[in-house]
Amino acid sequence: MTNNVRGYLQLHPFHLVGPSPWPIFTSFSLMDLAFSIALNSHGYMANNFYIILSIITVLYSMTLWFKDIIAESTYLGDHTIAVKRGLNQGFLLFVVSEILIFASLFWAYLHSAVNPTMDLGMSWPPVGIDVISPAELPLLNTIILLASGVTITYAHHALINGNRANTLYGFIYSTLLIALFVMFQFLEYKYAGFTITDGVYGSTFYSLTGLHGLHMIMLTIMLVICTWRVYNYDFTNTSHVGAETTILYLHVLDVIWLFIYIIVYWWGS
């Protein structure tokens, strides 16, 4: 479908998208993944089979969900003004919920860090914890995330101005930077001197950084999809809701990481 025809079909203010099964399927898959991780952490599972199965179901549900969204917006012309408004409002509510989740985890961390008990040796970090230096991989990851914020902003401005080539380059660079961040985060976990079972410090540290890492993996998938859609001429300078939500998602995760770096890595060390 050409952009002119698609724009004509999207002018009226009616909601054309029908009910979708994928949101509820994705929600149950995520809940199953959370339960699997919790049970595995407490030793109720002998292996990681259910975690791997949950990850597969999450990715499968999200793949079909994204496929339907792309088909509805690009090929069917169902993303009218009302649909776009609903997508933007829904994503803003998602961002607010994510901020509240991270706020609760920061609260849990600071509750023990500000007033450590005798069980923690009256000190923070607790006695016996070999903390990760904030001047090593965490600092490098911070620089990488700030750089990704620059490249995605460059891509956003290029998209608004109708410069497809620079938009594509910006999304490619951003995708590579976020993937590099995830890889360095994995290396940090691999060589860390403590685990999630090492008391309140280990549990709050891995809960904060691990949840952020899961969101970064999700962001990588979204960036790959946006990069492909830019390459496939799916976005125009006036219609690019998927790109805008991905860009906002990246900036929100950038800000959350800055709080993690300052509070957990720098102040908490």
Swiss-Prot record:
PANTHER family: CYTOCHROME C OXIDASE SUBUNIT 3 (PTHR11403:SF7), CYTOCHROME C OXIDASE SUBUNIT III (PTHR11403)
Catalytic activity: 4 Fe(II)-[cytochrome c] + O2 + 8 H(+)(in) = 4 Fe(III)-[cytochrome c] + 2 H2O + 4 H(+)(out)
SUPFAM superfamilies for this protein: Cytochrome c oxidase subunit III-like
Oligomeric form and interacting partners: Component of the cytochrome c oxidase (complex IV, CIV), a multisubunit enzyme composed of a catalytic core of 3 subunits and several supernumerary subunits. The complex exists as a monomer or a dimer and forms supercomplexes (SCs) in the inner mitochondrial membrane with ubiquinol-cytochrome c oxidoreductase (cytochrome b-c1 complex, complex III, CIII).
Organism ancestry: Eukaryota, Fungi, Dikarya, Ascomycota, Saccharomycotina
Keyword Membrane: yes
Compartments, as annotated in UniProt: Mitochondrion inner membrane
Topological category with respect to the lipid bilayer: Multi-pass membrane protein
Gene expressing this chain: COX3
GO molecular-function term, one example from the UniProt record: cytochrome-c oxidase activity
Superkingdom of origin: Eukaryota
Stated family: Belongs to the cytochrome c oxidase subunit 3 family.
PROSITE patterns membership: COX3 (PS50253)
Designated name of the protein: Cytochrome c oxidase subunit 3
